[in-house]
Amino acid sequence: MRVPRSQPWGLALLLLLLPGTLRAAESHRSLLYHFTAVSNPASGTPAFSLSGWLGPQQYLSYNNLRAQAEPYGAWVWESQVSWYWEKETTDLRDKEKLFLEALKVFGDRDSYTLQGLLGCELGPDNVSVPMAKYALNGEEFMEFDPKLGIWDGDWPEARTIGIKWMKHPEAVNKEKTFLLYSCPHRLLGHLERGRGNLEWKEPPSMRLKARPGNPGFSVLTCSAFSFYPPELQLRFLRNGLAAGSGEGDVVPNGDGSFYAWSSLTVKSGDEHQYRCWVQHVGPAQPLTVELESPAKSSVPVIGISIGFLLLMTVAAGGALLWRRRKGLPAPWIAFRGDDIGALLPTPGLSKDAES
């Protein structure tokens, strides 16, 4: 049994096919689902997870720990029919079972990662091109042919998995229907209802701070918060002249926006000669931020926070007194039956899809 060894760097194979490499990515005319199943997940991490993409923009997330399909980023505001996310959740739970069943073919002696990329893109003539590719431990593994209705690949294990999956007639029919009909229909619906999300531009808020570094030096850190799209240029200026871009990164926030930072080591005493310059499609002009004064940044925030807490306390007390005078129960005991679930907020909101 020749199975590729797990190579973390190789798991980017299918990620390279995510929006950004397809022609459709530029105009958001692709809808792709990226599935990942792992045989031996670390404690507290999902064995199965999925992200849904409209062009270069993620709009959906799912994992077996929460077991609910949820809109991602700005797509929580997309107007959808009430059953849409329920259907998406049901379909993804079925897909989760198939992926985890497939991993059992390899046994439990080693770790395996099975990935799938399913979806479609629309060409200039609105003709849909389906995609259904799978990778094992970062190597191309098998494909699904929607016309023949079969999963197949060069590996013996791929054929074994294909036979297992084809024992579920509903799985074959759902895969064919999704790739040939549901996917392009759903894509067009998202393009129509979510046009504002696809054109979403959120300018960054900026901060430049200094902290002690090695003796005789300070470290300047320029941060850009909550911006979209992720493309952003950041550099340091010294007395108005370019002084390098420093070292940093751009990472997702988890709500669809991004966070970026860059650090530069400078001589102690020279900190106030530096500015941070940022260019992004959100603001009309590039942003320049000066070094933040610790005294200025902390006192107002603390004062505002304390004032806000006092205001909320007074308001809550007044509301409770009013309810008691009216003979009404306190708000935290007004929940009944199904409402009990609302007592604990969930990390994400729920709203749009179908698979």
UniProtKB/Swiss-Prot annotation:
Gene Ontology annotations of biological process type: immune response
InterPro entries documented for this protein: Ig-like_dom (IPR007110), Ig-like_dom_sf (IPR036179), Ig-like_fold (IPR013783), Ig/MHC_CS (IPR003006), Ig_C1-set (IPR003597), MHC_class-I_related (IPR050208), MHC_I-like_Ag-recog (IPR011161), MHC_I-like_Ag-recog_sf (IPR037055)
Keyword Translocase set for record: no
Assigned keywords, A-Z: Cell membrane, Disulfide bond, Endosome, Glycoprotein, Immunoglobulin domain, Membrane, Receptor, Signal, Transmembrane, Transmembrane helix
Region feature Alpha-3, mapped onto this chain: 202-291
Residues forming coiled coils: none
Cytoplasmic-side segments: 322-355
SUPFAM superfamilies for the chain: Immunoglobulin, MHC antigen-recognition domain
Subcellular compartments: Cell membrane; Endosome membrane
Region described as Alpha-2: 112-201
GO cellular component: endosome membrane; external side of plasma membrane; extracellular space
Tissues in which the protein is found: Expressed in liver and mammary gland of non-lactating animals. Expressed in hepatocytes and in epithelial cells of portal bile ductuli. Not expressed in the brances of portal veins or hepatic arteries. Expressed in the epithelial cells of the acini and ducti in the mammary gland with expression emphasized at the apical side. Not expressed in blood vessels of mammary gland.
Gene3D superfamilies linked to this entry: Immunoglobulins, MHC class I-like antigen recognition-like
Disulfide bond residue pairs: 222-276
Region listing for Connecting peptide, in residue ranges: 293-298
Glycosylated sites: 126
Limits of the Ig-like C1-type domain: 203-292
Highest taxon of source: Eukaryota
Segments of this protein annotated with the region Alpha-1: 25-111
Extracellular domain ranges by topology: 25-300
Main localization, broad class: membrane
Function: Cell surface receptor that transfers passive humoral immunity from the mother to the newborn. Binds to the Fc region of monomeric immunoglobulin gamma and mediates its selective uptake from milk. IgG in the milk is bound at the apical surface of the intestinal epithelium. The resultant FcRn-IgG complexes are transcytosed across the intestinal epithelium and IgG is released from FcRn into blood or tissue fluids. Throughout life, contributes to effective humoral immunity by recycling IgG and extending its half-life in the circulation.
Subunit field text: FcRn complex consists of two subunits: p51, and p14 which is equivalent to beta-2-microglobulin. It forms an MHC class I-like heterodimer. Interacts with albumin/ALB; this interaction regulates ALB homeostasis.
Entry's family note: Belongs to the immunoglobulin superfamily.
Protein's name in the database: IgG receptor FcRn large subunit p51
Gene: FCGRT
